[in-house]
Regions:
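Conserved nucleotide- and phosphate/pyrophosphate-binding catalytic cores
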Residues: 1-180
Length: 180
């Protein structure tokens, strides 16, 4: 686990942080240490660079999984949710994201996966409750906008016919309630 002072000094060396360290940066550093307790200070550099980037790379097949109306509108709703929050720390995302997803028929698991893929391009990582304040409002909204833009250009919401295994490919879809 990186110590906060050592991490702050390393971030200054890497050009990620000014000197003296602003009070808000200490909160960010504490959140980073909580999110990545198994990493060393030197391991932190690529993680911090990825968190500070305005975009992330979503592997092609994972992006294809997002290519449906349900996920597109869900991700847009997550952006609206974030935009309405004055503070991203302490959000009850484990409760709120599945609740937002219900409107689009997405399962809890799909809601959390879609959110993580849209924001990081990865299936695994720290808790979203820690990831949101690490990314911040602007980066979350920029990344969501980029995903939605990418999905709507080119083929639009027309998914791949077949996956790399030659079998029919299906993106993540919501399930409509019976009788609804």
């Amino acid at each position: 686990m990186p110590e906060r002072e050592a991490l702050a000094a390393a971030m200054q060396r890497w050009g990620f942080l000014e000197d003296p360290v602003p009070a808000a940066a200490w909160q960010w550093i504490d959140t980073f240490v909580e999110a990545y307790p198994d990493r060393t200070t030197e391991d932190a550099r690529p993680l911090i660079a990825a968190l500070r980037a305005e975009a992330c790379i979503i592997p092609a097949l994972e992006l294809e999984r997002l290519r449906s109306r349900d996920t597109l509108f869900f991700v847009d709703s997550v952006g609206q949710y974030v935009d309405q929050q004055p503070e991203l720390r302490g959000l009850p995302l484990d409760r709120d994201l599945p609740e937002i997803a219900k409107e689009f028929g997405l399962s809890r698991e799909d809601a959390l996966l879609v959110t993580r893929l849209a924001l990081t391009g990865e299936r695994e990582g720290p808790a979203l409750e820690l990831l949101f304040p690490l990314l911040g409002h602007d980066r979350i909204l920029i990344r969501i906008g980029a995903v939605n833009s990418r999905l709507l250009h080119g083929r639009g919401l027309q998914p791949l016919a077949f996956g790399p295994d030659g079998k029919p490919f299906e993106p993540i879809h919501g399930e409509r309630p019976a009788g609804g």
